[in-house]
Amino acid sequence: MPKGYVVRRGVQRGRLARNVVVIAGAFSLAIAGGAVTAVPAGADPAPAATDTGNQPATTTPTATTTPTVTATPVADTGAEPDPAVSRIDTVITGEGGQRATAIVYSASMRKMIPIEILRPKDSSKPAPTLYLLNGAGGGEDSASWSARTDYEKFFADKNVNVVTPIGGTFSYYTDWQKDDKALGRNKWTTFLTKELPPLIDQRFGTTKTNSIAGISMAGTSVLNLAINAPKLYKSVAAFSGCARTSDPLGQAYIQAVVGTRGHGSITNMWGLPGTAGWRANDPYINAAKLRDTKVYMTSGSGLPGPYDRLGAKGVENNLDSLANQIVLGGLIEAAVNQCTKDMNKRMTQLKVPHEVINRPTDTHSWEYWAQDLKTIWPKIAKDLGVK
């Protein structure tokens, strides 16, 4: 395991009032004239972060993210690895061989990054790759595809590699202009579009055909990644993401995620709000650049849906969880829904092909994203050439 990779597990429940202050504070800035833009948050709206002294946080794999292992290190040549070259340091294979964790060194970020990988049903021949991103917590908390969904079971009979990085908490999976005291060095666009794909292709013998999908915060990120690397992905799927980032409303939400929750500086990310860095990372402004990529977007209305009740998966019989999910999850998803409608209108005006699902109910919650993935998968599979 990479040095400093420590567990940060679980979103504390039962703190609804504090959650409302953190998230609703941003919404009060963003609701004007009936127009709402989304606060891209992680899976479960998290409590306000406590003061950590503004130091970089470190994280650790849980039993979910680290399978029972057979570790395959890179051959020792006797020489120190070149810090300017990204590499796969170790591959840890779980029982059955379909689940693996690769420890990847990123030269741009100068650190090891765990990558969760689901291998295809038939690994004897090349398969395409779906890059599947977590939300604001980066998978370092309990809010991750592996911890909150049955995605491993879903992909077990499919001939595709599913690649999910663990990290990037509150980073928007973007290249930050400056290092940040709280969130460290973030060069995620470089890592995800330039460093990681060739390593995955070489080590796992892929077809070099890719798609990408993400939820919440990463629903914004995947659109930007596809814009920045137009030939890398056949398709992009944004589940409950918000495409608008550079207008005052979008800036308020990013401040809520990066600043309020992450204790990071948004000026370290893209510069001063309103400057070129923000416009360059606004999928709404740059929507025309998605013309040659299949685009899928989903969102709910924010009204309670089938998983927003006691006894439902993810809620069980916890009243605090249900209150968080309905109040905060509903508020966030209502804003995301409007943002998705705005992006739909923008892409329609530009005549950029895309598909949108706006559900009449549903909150900002994992069970709906798990269903979104299953709903959109046949389209992504077709894009990737998976039969």
Where are these regions (language model features)?
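Non-catalytic cap/lid and distal C-terminal segments of serine-dependent acyl enzymes
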Residues: 2-387
